[in-house]
């Protein structure tokens, strides 16, 4: 009845509707969508955008789900002027297990033997979750040679003075 599309290959309504044509009731995409027709939701942050009529939704990404709840709390309580996320992330299926050609030369290196500085789609995805922070969020990714895991470091400049006690 339900499909969790997590291959990373199908990111548009057109591609995902094939599941619905095969009799599936709902599709949940595990990466940010490539078209605006698909709502992107992080539970506990913006699930109120759903009205129940959606057949296809995106659950953003693991990194977006990691950063969004923290960013939401800080933004609601202090306002965010600038945000920069650095994600340390296990290698992904976009990387090769051995050296070979790739459109991004850094990702051409063997994933299981290389620390790879790269981009992160989470910064862009966060601006979809928090449209008011559109020109505020930046970020980078570092892929590391482990098969699973993710860590996000956020540096924030907030609108009002705060203390460690207030944040905690």
Where are these regions (language model features)?
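N-terminal Rossmann-like NAD(P) cofactor-binding subdomain of oxidoreductases
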Residues: 1-108
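Active-site-lining helix/loop region of Rossmann-like oxidoreductase modules
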Residues: 52, 69-168
């Amino acid at each position: 009845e339900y499909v969790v599309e997590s291959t990373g290959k199908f990111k548009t309504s057109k591609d995902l509707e094939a599941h619905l044509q095969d009799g599936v009731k709902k599709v949940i995409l595990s990466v940010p969508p490539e078209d605006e027709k698909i709502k992107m939701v992080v539970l506990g942050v913006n699930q109120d955008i759903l009205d129940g009529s959606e057949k296809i939704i995106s659950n953003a990404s693991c990194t977006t789900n990691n950063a969004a709840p923290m960013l939401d709390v800080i933004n609601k309580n202090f306002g965010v002027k600038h945000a920069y996320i650095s994600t340390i992330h296990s290698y992904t299926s976009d990387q090769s297990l051995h050296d070979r050609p790739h459109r991004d030369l850094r990702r051409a290196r063997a994933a299981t033997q290389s620390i790879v500085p790269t981009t992160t789609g989470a910064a862009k995805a966060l601006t979809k979750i928090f449209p008011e922070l559109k020109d505020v969020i930046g970020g980078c990714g570092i892929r590391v040679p482990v098969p699973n895991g993710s860590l996000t470091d956020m540096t924030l400049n907030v609108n009002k003075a705060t203390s460690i006690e207030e944040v905690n």
